[in-house]
A protein has these predicted regions:
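Non-heme di-metal
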Residues: 1-164
């Protein structure tokens, strides 16, 4: 089996961030009737879109030689694990905002962010921006989820088209 390269690392990272964006787009469709939830899901969707742009920009700055270097096997394992996530499958099973919150929380604490942080540290050229990027890209998501309030309120906000 050929060794994974940096080009594959970036391709799979972009695929994972795109799946996360699709998940938040789906949450926006399901909970857009609630302004508070809609604001959070739109911000999260926008962030995932920004992650894709960031990854594309960093990849574009790498030389062809760098792109053909071997990728970190542990990061590739984590990415392949993340890519098992199916936004459509999860969205079909959501009944209320509390369900959505828990899946979003799980996604934000998954290996997708570990890989993004790895890429920021390994491939982003400007060290002064690294800490800012990690805070902006990763920690802001967790803070946004807190805006969705407590579990009792989240359970009271039903999805537009709950299953069943």
């Amino acid at each position: 089996m050929p060794e994974d390269t940096i080009v594959t690392l970036f391709a799979l990272s972009i695929e994972a961030e795109t799946a996360a964006r699709e998940f938040y787009e789906g949450l926006l469709r399901l909970f857009g009737h609630n302004p508070r939830a809609a604001r959070v899901w739109e911000e999260m969707r926008s962030d995932e879109e920004e992650h894709v742009r960031f990854l594309e920009e960093v990849r574009a700055r790498l030389t062809p030689e760098q792109l053909q270097e071997p990728a970190d096997p542990e990061m590739m394992r984590k990415l392949r694990n993340v890519l098992k996530f199916s936004p459509q499958e999860v969205l079909r099973g959501l009944r209320d905002l509390n369900d959505a919150y828990h899946y979003a929380h799980e996604l934000e604490h998954s290996e997708i962010n570990t890989v993004l942080e790895f890429i920021i540290h390994e491939y982003h050229i400007d060290p002064a921006l690294r800490v800012q990027l990690v805070d902006t890209y990763l920690q802001a998501h967790v803070k946004r989820l807190l805006a969705l309030g407590g579990a009792a309120w989240r359970r009271s906000v039903l999805a537009n088209n709950p299953p069943g």
